[in-house]
Regions:
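Structural marker for long, regular alpha helices in very large eukaryotic proteins
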Residues: 1-27, 31-50, 58, 64-262
């Protein structure tokens, strides 16, 4: 499969090839691992803002990208207006960058940890959260990806959690630098994504509990949990009060109070 993909990639344009790779991630679960192997070799890195500003790399308009209001009905979901709707990624991902985001999000829902790990590796190496390519995507697509990415903490797998933390906190090992990176690039999107999911009125108990479990799991990483608690805890309790139903009581009672106090 990998050899076939390599031959195909050499005969078509990059944008056409990668568009079909995103479709493979969405529609062909059994082919995700070969697709990820090919993407890991061929997908160019999309530099961070600092790297782009220092090198003067030009950006091209990205059709369908850029901030926009979403149909989620929350003014808080409107993105900051200082993100330029430009990115040098249209020739890679194609005109619909949202297709790339949806491909990543679909693969992150895969039951195989190897697939989830491969997507997180791609995100941390080629689509960093501080890159112009990521910030040029639609706000709704950013939220979609954030919801899918944060869901990996529910697997309780250290390799997945470590990659998630790296994407949210940046490449530095210094806690102060990580917190500064989180507040500048990740925190607001993380807050909005979790709050939107908390406010959804799902009929399924598992779906209603999911964002709260993610919130509690993220508290395990102090650099994330401390800042996230400051901006989300009141909204979380308000949403919990609205959405809690009798059949949820047993699940809530099993939550460790120490994790909340942390």
């Amino acid at each position: 499969m990998a050899a076939l993909l390599d031959r195909v990639s050499g005969t078509v344009s990059p944008s056409f090839f990668f568009q079909n790779m995103w479709l493979v991630l969405i529609t062909a679960p059994n082919s995700r691992i070969p697709a990820l192997n090919s993407l890991a070799r061929r997908l160019p890195k999309m530099e961070s803002e600092d790297s782009q500003s220092s090198t003067g790399t030009p950006f091209r308009p990205c059709l369908g990208g850029g901030p926009s209001r979403t149909p989620l009905g929350d003014r808080a979901l409107t993105p900051p207006l200082d993100h330029p709707p430009l990115a040098g990624v249209a020739h890679i991902a194609g005109e619909d960058i949202g297709l790339m985001i949806r491909g990543f999000a679909a693969a992150l829902e895969d039951s195989q940890i190897l697939v989830q790990r491969g997507i997180l590796d791609l995100l941390t190496t080629t689509l960093k959260i501080d890159s112009q390519a990521f910030k040029a995507t639609r706000w709704a697509d950013q939220i979609l990806l954030m919801r899918a990415v944060t869901g990996v903490v529910l697997r309780r797998d250290l390799s997945l959690s470590r990659r998630l933390y790296s994407w949210l906190l940046g490449p530095s090992d210094n806690s102060d630098v990580q917190i500064a990176y989180l507040k500048e690039h990740s925190l607001e999107l993380l807050r909005v994504a979790l709050k939107a999911e908390m406010d959804e009125q799902s009929t399924e108990s598992v779906d209603r509990q999911r964002p709260f479990k993610i919130f509690i799991s993220l508290l395990d990483k102090w650099e994330i949990g401390h800042s996230l608690t400051e901006v989300l805890v009141l909204d979380a309790f308000a949403a919990l009060q609205v959405s809690l139903r009798p059949d949820d009581h047993d699940e809530v009672s099993r939550i460790d109070p120490a994790s909340i106090r942390a």
